[in-house]
A protein has these predicted regions:
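Bacterial N-terminal signal peptides that target proteins for export
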Residues: 2-15
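C-terminal His-loop and adjacent cap/lid subdomain of alpha/beta-hydrolase
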Residues: 26-28, 40, 44-387
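Long, acidic (E/D-rich), serine/proline-rich intrinsically disordered low-complexity regions
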Residues: 31-35
Length: 387
């Protein structure tokens, strides 16, 4: 995939458009801020060091427990080349088939799974109106969309040519977002917009299990997997952390959550999302029904050796209105959550960028790249950073 200035502008327009969509659906924020512009990504390099496939399961792996997903057929794809893979049974919100993108290497058993971001929708207007608040709901997402997706060359974690990318020599999986439910739903419902019925598939979590089946068959030896995502994909990484860990029983799964902040939205909004999407929350986490903030303590207790990294702006101009919070309210909630990280979450750290924007990985600072590298490498110098 070649990166051009038009691609840079396309991703900037994507986030700007999402902000306008949110406003058009009756939500507003009390601050100002501009969406970020992407950093580019040249073509992948040709070499990579060999990993040791005999490494025993690291701390955090569940070892011999029964996997929750059965391994399916392995994915076969060209080396170090982005390849689209249709996944049987996976659907977008419009019911059309979808799949995943892979960039594989035989030189490592380590895996990065990256979940695409792009808003959310929960009723007729937000899903099927003229300005839907979730990406790819109207269009679906297949090979055509994959081949022109502006996020892939913009996110540096997906760029094999970036010497600062700790995943440049690992297997990379890109999970597109077209279900409008932050990868959490399993429900088919019908919305009527202006007299037209739209069957809507909130199948994000169902799709994840289908993808996991193929990934288990493709990476049977992996002992290290990182689940990352931005915006809705960041929330999806948090929602599906346990699902991945229980599936990859011989691996340790760590999470990089960019702009899917585990803070609680307006209670009515959270209740609506849970109901409309049939949100699939961890069965053994009763408090998770109260809001995303409960996930922090749940993961801390259940996976004490797994790492959880959060990236956020001080004032998130996209997430605040989605949660029906003003920017000031968002900042206060974020600060409270960060304080809780400091006192309660030994293996969870954050990197907070100053200002009002959204998604740090598209224009990463040198300091952010250093922080991500420290997290992935297992460095004991990995710590929290905020303005």
């Amino acid at each position: 995939m070649l990166v051009t200035q038009s691609r840079h502008n396309a991703l900037a327009s994507v986030f700007a458009g999402l902000a306008l969509m949110v406003s058009a659906c009756g939500m507003s924020s009390s601050g100002e801020g501009a969406p970020v512009a992407p950093a580019g990504a040249p073509a992948p390099p040709s070499g990579a060091p060999t990993a040791d496939p005999g490494t025993p399961p690291p701390a955090g792996a569940t070892g011999t427990s029964t996997p929750s997903v059965v391994a399916g057929a392995p994915i076969v794809a060209p080396e170090r080349t982005w390849t689209w893979v249709d996944i049987a049974g996976a659907t977008c919100a419009d019911g059309s088939p979808t799949g995943i993108g892979v960039n594989l290497t035989k030189d490592s058993d380590d895996v990065l799974v990256f979940l695409e971001g792009g808003g959310a929708c929960w009723d007729a207007a937000s899903c099927w109106g003229p300005a839907p608040t979730a990406f790819n709901v109207l269009t679906g997402y297949g090979k055509t969309q994959f081949d022109t997706d502006p996020q892939i060359p913009a996110i540096y974690l997906l760029d094999r040519s970036d010497s600062d990318n700790p995943f440049r020599d690992k297997n990379i999986v890109y999970v597109p977002y077209c279900t409008g439910d932050s990868f959490s739903g399993d429900k088919v419902t019908t919305f009527n917009y202006l007299g037209v019925d739209h069957e809507t598939h909130f199948s994000g979590h169902k799709n994840i299990n289908l993808y996991l089946s193929r990934l288990l068959g493709t990476f049977p030896k992996t002992t290290r997997l990182w689940l990352a995502g931005d915006s809705a994909g960041g929330f999806g990484a948090s929602f599906n952390f346990g699902t991945f860990q229980e599936a990859f029983t011989k691996a340790r799964v760590d999470v990089i959550d960019d702009s899917g902040q585990p803070i609680d939205p307006d209670p009515a909004k959270w209740a609506q999302w849970r109901s409309v999407w049939n949100m699939q929350l961890p069965a053994d986490c009763a408090d998770c029904a109260k809001g995303p903030s409960a996930f922090v303590d749940y993961y801390r207790a259940k996976y004490p050796t797994n790492r959880f990294g959060l990236i956020s702006f001080d004032y998130d101009v996209i997430i605040a209105p989605f949660m029906s919070l003003s920017l000031t309210q968002f900042h206060d909630e974020l600060t409270s959550m960060l304080d809780h990280f400091d006192t309660s979450f030994t293996n969870g750290h954050y990197f907070v960028l100053p200002g009002a924007s959204h998604v740090g990985l598209v224009t990463p600072t040198t300091e952010l790249k250093t922080w991500v590298k420290a997290m992935v490498s297992g460095s004991t110098n990995w710590d929290s950073v905020r303005p």
